Amino acid sequence: MRSLVGDLVLVRLQEERDPLLHKRLYNALRRAILDGSLAPQSRLPPSRDLAGELGVSRNTILTTYEQLLAEGYVVSRRGSGTFVAQTAPESSLTAKEERENNSLAAPTAHLSRRGQHLLGQVSASPRQWGAFIPGVPDVNAFPHPLFSKIQARISRRPKPERLSYSCNGGTPELQQALVDYLRVSRGVHCQSDQILITEGIHQAIDLVTRMLCDNGDLAWVEEPSYWGIRHVLAMNDVRAEPLTVDANGLCPPETVDDAPRLIFVTPSHQYPLGAVMSLERRQRLLALARQQGSWIVEDDYDSEFRFSGQPIPALQGLVADAPVVYIGTFSKTLYPGLRLGYVVIPRPLVSDLKHAHAELYRGGHSLIQMALAEFITAGHYSAHIRRMRLLYSRRRAFLTELIQRHCMPYALSDFSDNAGLHLILNLPAEADDVAIAREANARHILVRPLSRYYLTAAHKKGLLMGFASQPEEQMASAFSVLLGCLQTHCPQMLLLREDAEKQNAPT
């Protein structure tokens, strides 16, 4: 006849999935102790008896008991046996306590108002891979074997200092590689000590905002703009003033009543609308920044991916000693999970920003930085970008053709400049782009609503559609699903079947 503990363990064993029997047994007993099914001070059967009840070897039971004993879940009393400990070693709540507490308090009950505000504004999606996701490259096209080979060789005998924290803003190899690359490809003028390696654009924006702004300071942002900028500003109690964007980029005001401390711009390819800032606007913005004592933060977004014409040189290199903090990332050219970006720091700020970065973030990833430096200097990086430019150009043309075949002529963005990794599908003013995106996301179509990129209520409606990450056949299949969402929410923007057939008929 089995004991109560034996019956309990048999039931719990059926719920465990580990291939190793002793681990399934350990997990079953541990879970029973934590949720109160095995009460404190209750006696466990002798190892020989429990082995017989369960039909397993005694060694399996002994191994399990020893593990529970070592971790403090049970205690052994000489001559008396093995007992459940009075207090489980877990510092977290038991499942029962957790359920009771969750019924009494909201998840954000102990967050600061700032933290609650941040979570209330969350825009990052838990899904970061799929059809039409904006800003994500084709990570499968990255030369992983080549990069892994470089990494393996560098990691074979690393110097000890390469395995510690980095307090110099990155490895000298990557800093110099970026100086040379940015000078040739983007017209950026700097020396290697002005390069600071970060863990992406977000960290760069946070560092610059923390170090250059006080509470209540003003920052200009493009309208619409990258939501991450607005969130970082809000978290640092910096006011964000949206400035209109037209076909020539950000529109600086004629007069300035309240001087901004920072001016955030994406002049080479405005995010998300795609406009290129004209030379006249760039010169006006530089003059205004000097006059007002402001710093321009230039996010050189998608500058590598122009599919016609010549790349637009960076704002940073337009004049000597420009009041520009230039930031970039490898997320779009290589892959987002690399988590490497960079800042070109103006000379007067170099020492302070590097020291602040070391204190706030404790930089690292030195071996990956060295591998990336070799990848760049050996010419692999430029070659990869050239290959991707051709691939993305074809995919952009394919998505453009899909939209033109099925949607009204106004569906493609006015500001499209044949660059970047996404298109904007314009929607009628009365459409609810958030609802459309929500329904599409539920069907694993990862479009983003354009209205969410605006700070004010006067916003356009549309969908950001990335074309880089997925091949043409997957885009075609996903577009059919998206058409179903559009048919439900705004059928007026779709061409009738006979109109579509006429438009696509050979002439």
Regions picked out by a protein language model, each given a short descriptive name:
Residues 342, 370-378:
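Helix-loop "lid/cap" segments that line or gate small-molecule binding pockets
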Residues 151-292, 304-305, 310-321, 325, ...:
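Conserved core of the PLP fold type I
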Residues 1-154, 348, 354, 358-365, ...:
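N-terminal basic, amphipathic alpha-helical segments
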Residues 319-352:
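Active-site PLP attachment segment
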Residues 137, 267-271, 332:
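Short glycine-rich anion-binding loops that position phosphate/pyrophosphate groups of nucleotides
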Residues 221, 242, 298, 372, ...:
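Hydrophobic residues in well-ordered beta-strands that form the structural core
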Residues 453-457:
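AMP-binding (ANL) adenylation modules
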